[in-house]
Amino acid sequence: YVALALWMTKYYVQEYGFNLQTAALLAACFSLPGGVLRAAGGWMSDKWGAHSVTWWVMWVSWICLFLLSYPQTEMVIQTVNGPQNLSIGLNATMFTVLIFIVGIAFAFGKASVFKYISDDFPQNIGAVSGIVGLAGGMGGFILPIMFGALVDITGVRSSAFMLMYGVVWVSLIWMYFSEVRKTPMMGQGANSPVSKAS
């Protein structure tokens, strides 16, 4: 979250040509829900469990990051009527909508992480919270450097989202084998909307 929040303004300036003020305003579409909606994420984690909320957060993030990671592409298609140019890529509006959704998902995810801590480490909440905070701080420091290195290596600005997509993909696989197969799909027993429907 911190890494993307730091990266967004520069991305808007370089990818879409906005001035700094407009870019910062649009970048807030990611940062604002990521901070404001944590309470809603905490409520959802209390109601359906941290594991379930995190699982769905991962899937929403995975889909959005896949779309965000696709670079601006120009293709020439040879048709019977001659060559046709085809442009594939997100315009600024679609990009902002997707990054807003990612911001909401990350807000819920941040809340569910601390629900994890209270559920799984009730005797060591302070120590584990400190480790989680350290990991978040290091991610906010290291990932922007990696984003810049990827842009230098590939020349593709959306490579930052490719990296995030890969991280979420690995996390989904890890979470599936370590947790999802052992728990109900949407929460804890009778409190799950899925179990009520069935």
In which residue ranges do the predicted regions lie?
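A membrane-interface helix-boundary motif in multi-pass transporters
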Residues: 149-166
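A late C-terminal transmembrane helix in Major Facilitator Superfamily
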Residues: 124-154
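Multi-pass alpha-helical transporter architecture, strongest
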Residues: 165-198
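C-terminal transmembrane helical hairpin of 12-TM major facilitator-type secondary transporters
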Residues: 51-113
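Extracytoplasmic gate region of multi-pass secondary transporters
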Residues: 1-35
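Residue-level signature of mid-helix packing/kink "hotspots" within the transmembrane helices
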Residues: 31-39, 137-141
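Paired intracellular helix-loop junctions of major facilitator superfamily
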Residues: 116-126
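Helix-to-loop junctions at the C-terminal end of transmembrane segments
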Residues: 37-49, 151-152
